Amino acid sequence: MEEFQRYFELDRYQQHDFLYPLIFQEYIYALAHDHGLNRSILLENAGYDKKSSLLIVKRLITRMYQQNHLIISANDSNQNPFLGHNKNLYSQMISEGFAVIVEIPFSLRLRSSLEGKEIVKSHNLQSIHSIFPFLEDKFLHLNYVLDILIPYPIHLEILVQTLRHWVKDASSLHLLRFFIHEYRNWNSLITPKRPSAHFSKRNQRLFLFLYNSHVCEYESIFIFLLTQSSHLRSTSSGVLLERIYFYGKLEHSVEVCAKDFKAILWLFKDPFIHYLRYQGKSILTSKGTSLLMNKWKYYLLNCWQCHFYVWSQPRRIYINQLSNHSLDFLGYLSSVRLNPSMVRSQMLENSFLIDNAIKKFDTIVPIIPMIGSLAKAKFCNVLGHPISKPVWADLSDSDIIDRFGRICRNLSHYHSGSSKKKTLYRIKYILRLSCARTLARKHKSTVRAFLKRVGSELLEEFFTEEEQVLSLTFPRAFSTSTSRGLYRRRIWYLDIICINDLANHE
């Protein structure tokens, strides 16, 4: 937010809640471009990064000033003199710039609500890896889990109505209406299995923001119920929500909902209950019984349908027992398994054999969905056999190796918390051989002949930085047995703020 303060005259705009003039400011597009630069490990936005420049931004702003009204329809570009031949580029730039603008009032309220309060502000919580040590600590003592697919609103106008409480600028709301009606693939954000490449690549930040702001409306009430029903009430229960404005909203919900929910709070008495969410999937875990989890399930369904105008079905919420269920979350399969052990006890002349089972939290990389992601990205076929990447064959050798190496390092970095590394080694093997096949295709040679001619040192980029850093951190593990010592360790990093593209199997 300090970055915004240096550029924006926020006091003047905030007095009237008037954000629309910011869309004519050049630095808005610079901030949006910096935010999206190299955000995809597959470099799908490289074309946009090369085309974007200050000159294009100036030309775009000039055209907006010259028009009596702003029309940016991708469907009738032949009749639209504003966009001309750059309709996709201009539309994407305005969409990403508008996403920066509409986040301003939420960021301001979040900052003001944090002032003077004893809420954890550690930067460690910004990493999505920070959730796994929490799960490791808590899941061993829980019984049931609700796998929840969050429903989507029945009408796009509901998204605008949600923001009307925070953005009073009618012009900004009209522009928002235009964007959400131009790209009608709203359902694809929550159900990514539907085809939505046009939607996800061009407007991801704006629609993720709209989705989070909408979900937060009923999450605020839900979090209130959780804190009221738990004996261990947390003063910072909103810290794991995707930070937009939620602290003030939660406090307001306590005042409004205290009277309304007293009658039902006794139904949800549970001292050990935890809730977490990422994008369109949320998880509710509890130490309670299956009856209690069924109460939560049907309460959520009724709350969504009766109070928030979203349609959901019971089959979108699954009740599972943690002891025999693997949790698919953030690209990992997490489970609680029993690790049996036998202890021999000697007392005087008698000896006893004691069977002891210890619960252990396991996190592994799911191999089948991972191969599916690699096959979709054209690194291998559906059976996991590496293939060449023809679209990269026109690049230089160094660029090809750099792209494959970056993907490999990012995957190793993201999946460093895996309990078993065999899956990760197989993925790295697929990427290395795919890189070799791509280079051989470019030079019109076979893989064997190409590697024999240039040497295996050409693929040294695939040795990850983590291996070098960890060799310094755990020198004994490297000196004794690297494969047995170091690579069995799970390591969670504090610089991962979003799920890896290839790890997002949904």
Swiss-Prot record:
Gene Ontology biological process: mRNA processing; RNA splicing; tRNA processing
Gene Ontology CC terms: chloroplast
Localization of this protein: Plastid, Chloroplast
Cited InterPro entries: Domain_X, Maturase_MatK, Maturase_MatK_N
A GO MF label: RNA binding
UniProtKB keywords: Chloroplast, mRNA processing, Plastid, RNA-binding, tRNA processing
Pfam families xref list: Intron_maturas2, MatK_N
Record-stated family: Belongs to the intron maturase 2 family. MatK subfamily.
The protein's role, per its UniProt record: Usually encoded in the trnK tRNA gene intron. Probably assists in splicing its own and other chloroplast group II introns.
PANTHER family named among the record's database cross-references: MATURASE K
Protein name: Maturase K
Organism: Mentzelia lindleyi
